[in-house]
Amino acid sequence: MKKFLFLFLILFAHFSLAQTDKINPKTPPTKDIFFKKENTPNAAPTQKIKQIHSDSINRKPDLYGGNMFFDGNVEFQHNGAVLTANRVVFYQKENFVKAIGNVVLVTSDGNRITAEEMEYDGETQRGIARKNVVLTDPKQTISTDVLYYDRVKNTAYFNSGGTINDGKSTMWTQAATYFIDSKMNEFTGNYTIDNAQYRVEGKNIKQYQSTNTADFFGPTTITNKQKPSNYVYTENGKYLMNQKEVYLNKNSRIHYNGKILTGDKMYYNQLTGFGKGEGNVRLDDPKEKRYIKGGYGEIFEKKDSAMITQKPYAVKELKNDTAYIAAEKFLTYQKPDSIDNTKKKSFLRAYKKVRMYMTKAQGRADSLSFNETDGVLHFFRKPIFWSGEKQITGDKIEAYFNTENENIDSLKVRGNAFAISKVDSLTMKDEFHQVKGKLMTVFYQNNEMKLAKVIGNAQSITYADSEDQKTKKIDRLGVSISNCGEIEALFEDRKIQILACNIGAQGEIYPMSKIAPEKRKFPDYNWNTKDRPLKWEDILVDTPNNEEKQYETDDTLFKKAEEIRLKEEEKRKPKTIKRDRKL
């Protein structure tokens, strides 16, 4: 009997409202352009929104355009979705509802939207939720002020600013679209993604919840929150958030430990600190005022080291010069100071076919090691060092820089040390001062070689001149050849002055008429002009292959003396008496 009475009351209410409709016609809703129906050929017929339950049914001419509204525990259904609210205004003819207060929309695939207000169109299956909107699905939660929801395309969109939380990261953006089927968030404009370790900031991103990956389509920065100076920048790339791996494809940089790696295509692993670059690679170290360019590079953030290959070269800015170095491979690394382990020293190593150019000095070797902090440069395996019209070779050469003015202070040559200096740089005469021995130390003054100390089987060949104090005319005395345990030689503009020749000293000056040209050079004389870099670009090739200078040998006096000597020898020979044979 009670059930019959309830049905009777509902039918009576509908009948009464129907009669009222004839007297006070209902006003259709004012719809947002979002609800405009698209012309879709062969589209399936739409279903009508159904009212399932409410505590009361009402209609007032001065409320909601005279349309029915339902109050108290209201429930409507449409195409598998359930809408509940405190009040729902039902525009029955337009198949449209407006829900007010504690609105909840649950879809058939488990998505849940809560809001203070919501409009839903049964014709387009689209809804607009407003005020304290939260969309929850198994992968994430979206919070915003206004959310546009399309059940047909299964997308949710906002442009009034919102946050997305997946339990691991919180994302903020002004505008985003959530593609529910593919679990993909597309952010347009500025966005921020925050988790416990990193912050991602940029423009335009597609973030996939199923795989926890992100594709970048605009300027993007990924910052280490524990160390904000370490960050990654790109304008196109991919971020694997679970693996903490980043692939960078356009205008990309990796900032780590005060250094910057750039390249055409790059990769970085946040867990291991390993990164690499391919194509137009550049490694900048602003603290050391040095950068390295090459075709390929790797960095090891936790070891604070890096490697650059594929025709690499390094450029280091000094206070009064610039050092250019090329090789087949470069390594850079930091190492704790042996005295104070709270400080680190910076090292640069180069391997295979090393070439170096500075304005005042040039060098070649098989490999190189540079302690940049202490200013010590080591050349290994067949090193050769040029400075002005002077050349030094040996088994190993060490260059020591003044750390204040960054000029060369001295050189140490270990094993088969050999220094050669052109007697007169303004002429093409084949005349060279030479000093050699086991060990050699060369001291610099104003970036020029000034003094050489040679220890162990020290030998020298120098050209001796005399100068008239009045006329300043210089006359050649001859060639001085010395053999000592130790030699100190002073380099001057046009000569080497032997300051000391100690321990078993033997020496003699030979007039030019009494020393053959081949005796004026040591057997291992190796003056090299073909491989010397004359400009910084020369280091970019294995050898500049300069045209070798052709020096003129001045042997006039020696030849004349030889002619006289040979004539004298001829005169001293006994004469042979010819005898006639008797028949």
Which sequence ranges carry the predicted segments?
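Positively charged n-region of N-terminal signal peptides that target proteins for export
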Residues: 1-4, 19
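N-terminal amphipathic/hydrophobic interface segments
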Residues: 19-583
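Sec/Tat signal peptide C-region and signal peptidase I cleavage site
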Residues: 14-18
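Sec-dependent N-terminal signal peptides
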Residues: 4-12
